[in-house]
Amino acid sequence: MAAILRYQLELFLLAVSFFSRIPVPVSLPYSSERMNQAGRYFALVGLLLGAICALVYSLATQLFSTNISVFLTMVLSLLLTGAFHEDGLADMADGVGGGMTAERRLEIMKDSRIGTYGSSALIMVLLGKYLLLTELADLTSLVPVWLLAYTLSRAVAASLIRNTPYVSDTDSSKSKPLAQQLSGTDVAVLSLTALATLLYFSWQFIGVMIAASLIFRQIFRQWLIRRLGGFTGDCLGAAQQLMEILIYLILLAFLQHEVMI
């Protein structure tokens, strides 16, 4: 049992090292197989990041206004992840916006330079998050909001690996170890982690959020297959960012119509 728990802890720390800038022991064992299995903890890494952001936001509100506290927490989030998912969103936007064929889109996505489409997507998403979070802060505590959004969005993004073709042909791609299909156990861990953050909310909200997550996943997956033939690591980052925005929108819709969440 101790060996099993140690192995799972090592997988979690591997996920932390891949999906964030949080330091982990340099002696952590690594292999492509372990990295693929670590995908099951993508949502748990989100929960950790959300908890850190929630704590810092709570402390910041003791010194600054809500708007400044939200801004500082967003900056912290970017530092914690190295803008990992935002980078994926920008690359995908450039590729899909600038390419006429799937091959050309994938080629553009490999270019590290950011273009007009990527810049526009980043501005809109970051501005959208700021506006939504400041609106939500006037209506409810942001602590459970950070936890839910950071966890569920990553669970949905990682679940795409389960049954979506991987289309990058770059052997050195940073997401290559995650390209294998997730096992049933991996999906179960992702789902249970996300569900844990939903239990704070009402059953009505939980039902809507689960339905919205499944619908978003299906629509985004089909769109990726049509436009690219499958997914790349950049697409997972884009999925996380868009799903996070969707979560904030649904929360705000519930609260503004005075429906209990």
Swiss-Prot record:
Q: Which cysteines are joined by disulfide bonds?
A: none
Name one matching Pfam family: CobS
- TM ranges: 9-29, 41-61, 64-84, 114-134, 141-161, 196-216, 235-255
Task: Reply yes or no: does the keyword Nucleotide-binding apply.
Answer: no
Q: What molecular functions are annotated in GO for this chain?
A: adenosylcobinamide-GDP ribazoletransferase activity; cobalamin 5'-phosphate synthase activity
Query: Does Mitochondrion appear among the keywords?
Result: no
UniProt pathway annotation: Cofactor biosynthesis; adenosylcobalamin biosynthesis; adenosylcobalamin from cob(II)yrinate a,c-diamide: step 7/7
Q: What class of enzyme is it?
A: transferase
Its record classes its membrane topology as: Multi-pass membrane protein
> Example GO biological process term?
cobalamin biosynthetic process
The entry's keywords: Cell inner membrane, Cell membrane, Cobalamin biosynthesis, Magnesium, Membrane, Transferase, Transmembrane, Transmembrane helix
EC identifiers of the protein: 2.7.8.26
- GO CC term, one of those recorded: plasma membrane
Q: What is its main location?
A: membrane
Q: Which reaction does it catalyse?
A: alpha-ribazole + adenosylcob(III)inamide-GDP = adenosylcob(III)alamin + GMP + H(+); alpha-ribazole 5'-phosphate + adenosylcob(III)inamide-GDP = adenosylcob(III)alamin 5'-phosphate + GMP + H(+)
The record's InterPro entries line, in alphabetical order, gives: CobS (IPR003805)
Q: Which cofactor does it need?
A: Mg(2+)
What family is this protein classified in? Belongs to the CobS family.
What biological function has been recorded for the protein in this entry? Joins adenosylcobinamide-GDP and alpha-ribazole to generate adenosylcobalamin (Ado-cobalamin). Also synthesizes adenosylcobalamin 5'-phosphate from adenosylcobinamide-GDP and alpha-ribazole 5'-phosphate.
User: What is the protein name stated in its UniProt record?
Assistant: Adenosylcobinamide-GDP ribazoletransferase
According to its UniProt entry, this protein's organism is Vibrio cholerae serotype O1 (strain ATCC 39315 / El Tor Inaba N16961)
The encoding gene: cobS
